[in-house]
Each structure stands twice: as structure tokens, then as C-alpha cells.
Amino acid sequence: MKDRYYSEDKMHELLADSERLLQVVSRFSIPLGVGDKTIEQVCRENHIDTATFLVIVNFTHSGGDYSYPHDTKIDLQTLKKYLQNTHIYLLKFLLPHIRRHLIDALGSSLNNDITFLIIKFFDEYYKELENHMNVEDKEIFMRLDELQKGKKIKKLSSEISRIHTAPIEQKLSELKNIIIKYYTSESDNNMIYNILQHLFICEYDLYIHDRIENLFLIP
């Protein structure tokens, strides 16, 4: 495992490094079958700015502690593509996937009140996150378009400022704690443990996503 990745490194090494980096690459719509091509070659073939790609990769890889070179020019279209695809992945794939398996797992719960509470908590969180990302789609991505055109960007609305003052992954941590402390079942617990693993993945994903937006887009 490398501490950081460079343009001359092989893309297949990056993809095989960790699940987190695999997810990052998928959000640039990069197909597999990369052979022995370098990161720069693969990015160029897929019309992705290599420098911006590496900033996001290394930022994620470091857990948000990566300080990219100050002379790095961030390509706004590449950044926008990554953020938009992250929204789609979370709202259309990962969270619905977790909910389906959550319902299956909770069917064997010994406490119907806890089952109801967990599903209700999850659904409320999904709606909150959906609203959060809808606001971002309108304001954050509009800011990216304005920046790319060289326009002076408008002041952030109170709504977008408000949703970026509290970590969006915090409630997922609360949901994990509810399941860990109060969920009981007489059946196989493999499914609920798998759900917890996916909640950890989602929590980290949202943490990095929020950090990237705050780093590049929130003054």
C-alpha cells in the first residue's frame, strides 16, 4: 500500500489498493481493463484531469489529511463529475441497498419497537440527506459552473451554509449505535453485521465528500 499516488503509478495498483480507492475511481466513470497503463494514461483516455483526479484520490486515501501542492490547478468539470456521481451512488445505490438488507435483517428482531425505530430513523436520515444533496445540486454545482466561466460567485444562501455546519455523516453514527446497543435476534447475525460494515463505508464516504466540498467550494 502506497502513502500516496502519482501520475506515473499504474492504475491497476491503485484499483487493487483498497475498497475506498476503488469507489473513488468508479465515480469518474473509468472502466476496468486498464492493463499496465499509468494513471495519467487512463485519465487522458477518459478525458479526466489527472491532477484533480490525484488530489481526490490522495485526499481520500489519507483520510482527509492530504495537503495537495498549492500550485495544483483544480479542473472544475472533473471535480463536478466526481461530486455528482457521488450523489448518485449514495442516493440511488448504496443507501437503498442498505435499506433493503436492513428490512430483511430486522425481520428476525426480537423487539418490534426497535425495528420500527431503526427503519424510521433510517428513512428520516435518507430524506435529510436527499434534501442536503438537492440543495447542493442547485447551489454548489451552479458555483462550479460560474467559477469555470470566470464569473464572480454569489454569496452562499443561508440554507447551504447551514447544512455545511453539521457533519452529514453524524446521524449514521447514531444509527450504528442504536443497532449495536439495542438490536437483538435469535437468527444468524451475519446480515446485520454486514449492514453495519456498509454503514461504516457510507459514513466515511460522506465524511470525505463533505470535506472535499468544504475544501474547494465553501468559503
Predicted feature residues:
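Small-residue-biased structural context
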Residues: M1-P219
